[in-house]
Structure formats: structure tokens, C-alpha cells
């Protein structure tokens, strides 16, 4: 049965009951893990989940008594540090084309950005933002902050005291910069909270912080820089010695795999959405090559339809797509070469017909029993003959 994103947010922040087998199966409570790593395809609801999780923490804070609204807002802000698409929306370009003024990247003023930028300014972190940004972008492309950290201009340093100004970043470079701002703050959070004695910390701004929620950072990076970013993030998380919890969502198999292999003490999930508007958060074992690649998503979707006796005509299209991806990976020139030899022509015609059935006014939505059996036959043939790994069922 599906859940709402608010219910999944509650699941992520609550110790879970798991079954263990000693001499007999017993139920135990698993504490909220240090790292929860979530894979989901684009459009599933990752960003909405990060928003619902933030709202969940706010509702817990607002249950308190004896605090006015401003105090509650400050407390909720300090309980979670988050990065998502809404974080990027807090930055915008000021382009004065008529006056040919230098483009400026400006920050939307609100309680969150005021808190964040004031901390970075007070901690003297502008040089670290520049360093992180140049690592993932261009080592000559240099940000310049105004005194309040509310406006940023960019120049290209030539190395001979020459500077090319009037530079506006590409969308990818802009995402890199915003991530660098967040990562710089996160680095300070981990470093400061690693000081066990609160009285000895450089600032008390993070004393109430419980969670860091990171949703799909810098999806515009090439693979090499994405791997570097994931390794750096994993290293920072591993260096955290406090009780801080991390939740990371991504649609990138590469980013997921690096974090999966680099991090210990993690619990991994796949987030799925259903047509009725509900969601499922399913615990997974193994990296994305075993659990999350798109071809495996296709296979699992078809398997579920077969198990539920809910095969529809579009499942033939998914099946053909699965055959095509498997054939491409194995080096076959045609996907039809993977079909059973004795029925290849017949089955190929069926898949081609049903894949293009939208062109026919006579096509009905419900496949015949024979067509449903064909889907199962073809899927079983592919699984049994192309070496698909079968995940074993595990207890917690």
C-alpha cells in the first residue's frame, strides 16, 4: 500500500522496527542511521520529499510551548540544513542590459539566506567558496562578493593581472557555484560540531542541527567531476563525529554508486511513485548496478504487473525496451536476436504490433490471456538466458 511523501518523511526520521533471526525471529528497533541514501528516477518526488521532511521538522518544533513564532522559525531553521532545487531558486541574475552593467548574481533575502550568508561572512568563508567552485568549474573563473555577501560578480583571471569582467555564468556553472556555497557551509558545520564541548565551539549556530538533506547536487557536472564531488562529500560525511544525520537523494547511478561504496553505516532505499499519487520507500541492498539501473526498473515493473495479473498493452512496449537495452549492452546488432529461436518471428511481430498499437483505432486496452502469457514467457526467457542477477530476500 502506497504512502504520502509526508509519511515517508516521518519514516526517514523515526527509528524502524526490523526483524532479526537469532534462534528465532525477533523484532528490534533500529535507530535512525547516520546516512540514508535514496535513489529515484527524475520526476518521482525527491524534491517534494525534501520539502515535506523540512515541514515535518518544523511541525515538531511548533508543537513546543512557550515560544513565539519567530523563536520557533529560528529553531526549525537550525534543525535542518537542506540543499534542493528551491535552494538554487534563491539565487537570481540582475541584468541591466540598457546600461551594459556588470551582471550580478543576487540572493533572495529571506530568513534562511540571511542566516546562511551571515554565518559564511562571519566565519570568513568567501575564499573557501572560491576554492570549491574553481575545483568543479574553471580555476580562472573567480567569484567576487560584496561586503554583505548578497551580490556576486564573476571575472576570468588571466594570470598577468588582467581580468575579464562582465561575465555571466552558464546554468551549469551557476549550479556549481550555489553548491559550493552550500558545501562550504556544510564543511563548517561538520568541523564545528566535531568539537565535543559546545562551550569551545567557534559558533553555537549549529548546536540544534539534527539533519542535512541533500537532493541531487549539481546534476550538470560531467562524470569525472561528479565522481570527485561524491568522493569529497563522502569524505566530509565520514569525518563527522557528531550525531548529525544525512539524507541524500539522487537520480544519478554514478553519484549513488560512489556514495554507496565510500560510506559505511548507511541504509539505502529506492523511492517510487504510483499512479494514485502515493509513494513507496523500499530498502535495497547493493549498488545501483544491482538495484536501480533503468533496465532493472523495467524488469521489476513488468514482474510486478505479471504478479498482480495486471498486464496491459503498454507492458509490451516496456518489454521491447528491456530487450533493446539488454541487446545493446551485450553487443547484439538487433534486439530480436535475443528472442526464443523457435518463436522469434511470431513474437517479434507481436511486440512490434503492440508497441505501435496507438496507431490503430481497433486496439483494446485489455490484452488477451494469450498476450499476457507472452509477456511472461518473453521476460522469463530474457532473465534465464541473459544472466540477470536475482536479488535474494534479506532480513534487516
Swiss-Prot record:
GO molecular-function terms, A-Z: endonuclease activity
Keyword Cytoplasm listed: no
Null allele phenotype: Loss of ACNase activity.
Keyword Nuclease: yes
Keywords: Endonuclease, Hydrolase, Nuclease
EC number: 3.1.-.-
Functional note: Anticodon endonuclease (ACNase) that triggers the cleavage ligation of tRNA(Lys). It is activated by T4 stp protein and masked by the prrD protein (the endonuclease subunit of EcoprrI). The prr locus restricts phage T4 mutants lacking polynucleotide kinase or RNA ligase; T4 mutants lacking these genes manifest a T4-induced anticodon nuclease (ACNase). It is thought that Stp and other T4-encoded ACNase factors counteract the masking agents, thus activating the latent ACNase.
Protein's name according to its UniProt entry: Anticodon nuclease
Amino acid at each position: 500500500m502506497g504512502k504520502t511523501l509526508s509519511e515517508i518523511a516521518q519514516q526517514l526520521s523515526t527509528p524502524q522496527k526490523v526483524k532479526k533471526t537469532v534462534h528465532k525471529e525477533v523484532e528490534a528497533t533500529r535507530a535512525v542511521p547516520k546516512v540514508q541514501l535514496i535513489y529515484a528516477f527524475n520526476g518521482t518526488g525527491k524534491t517534494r520529499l525534501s520539502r515535506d521532511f523540512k515541514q515535518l521538522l518544523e511541525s515538531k518544533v511548533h508543537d513546543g510551548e512557550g515560544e513565539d513564532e519567530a523563536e520557533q522559525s529560528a529553531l526549525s531553521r537550525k534543525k535542518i540544513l537542506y540543499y534542493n532545487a528551491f535552494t538554487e531558486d534563491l539565487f537570481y541574475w540582475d541584468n541591466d542590459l540598457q546600461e551594459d552593467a556588470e551582471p550580478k548574481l543576487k540572493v533572495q533575502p529571506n530568513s534562511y539566506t540571511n542566516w546562511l550568508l551571515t554565518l559564511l561572512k562571519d566565519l570568513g568563508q568567501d575564499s573557501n567558496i572560491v576554492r570549491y567552485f574553481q575545483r568543479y568549474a574553471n580555476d580562472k573563473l573567480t567569484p567576487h562578493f560584496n561586503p554583505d555577501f548578497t551580490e556576486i560578480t564573476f571575472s576570468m583571471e588571466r594570470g598577468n593581472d588582467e581580468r575579464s569582467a562582465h561575465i555571466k555564468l552558464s546554468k551549469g556553472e551557476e549550479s556549481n557555484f550555489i553548491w559550493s556555497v552550500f558545501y562550504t557551509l556544510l564543511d563548517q558545520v561538520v568541523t564545528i560540531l566535531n568539537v565535543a564541548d559546545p562551550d569551545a565551539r567557534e559558533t553555537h549556530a549549529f548546536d540544534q542541527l539534527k539533519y542535512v538533506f541533500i537532493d541531487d547536487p549539481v546534476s550538470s557536472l560531467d562524470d569525472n567531476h561528479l565522481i570527485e564531488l561524491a568522493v569529497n562529500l563522502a569524505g566530509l560525511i565520514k569525518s563527522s563525529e557528531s550525531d548529525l544525520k544525512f539524507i541524500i537523494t539522487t537520480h544519478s547511478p554514478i553519484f549513488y554508486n560512489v556514495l554507496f561504496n565510500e560510506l559505511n553505516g548507511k541504509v539505502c532505499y529506492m523511492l517510487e511513485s504510483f499512479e494514485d499519487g502515493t509513494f513507496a520507500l523500499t530498502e535495497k541492498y547493493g549498488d545501483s548496478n544491482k538495484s536501480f539501473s533503468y533496465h532493472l526498473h523495467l524488469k521489476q515493473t513488468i514482474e510486478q504487473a505479471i504478479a498482480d495479473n495486471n498486464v496491459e498493452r503498454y507492458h509490451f512496449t516496456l518489454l521491447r525496451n528491456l530487450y533493446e537495452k539488454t541487446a545493446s549492452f551485450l553487443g547484439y546488432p538487433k534486439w530480436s536476436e535475443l528472442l526464443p529461436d523457435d518463436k522469434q518471428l511470431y513474437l517479434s511481430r507481436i511486440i512490434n504490433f503492440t508497441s505501435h498499437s496507438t496507431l490503430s483505432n481497433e486496439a483494446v486496452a485489455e490484452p488477451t490471456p494469450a498476450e499476457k502469457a507472452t509477456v511472461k514467457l518473453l521476460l522469463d526467457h530474457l532473465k534465464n538466458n541473459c544472466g540477470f542477477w536475482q536479488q535474494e530476500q534479506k532480513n534487516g
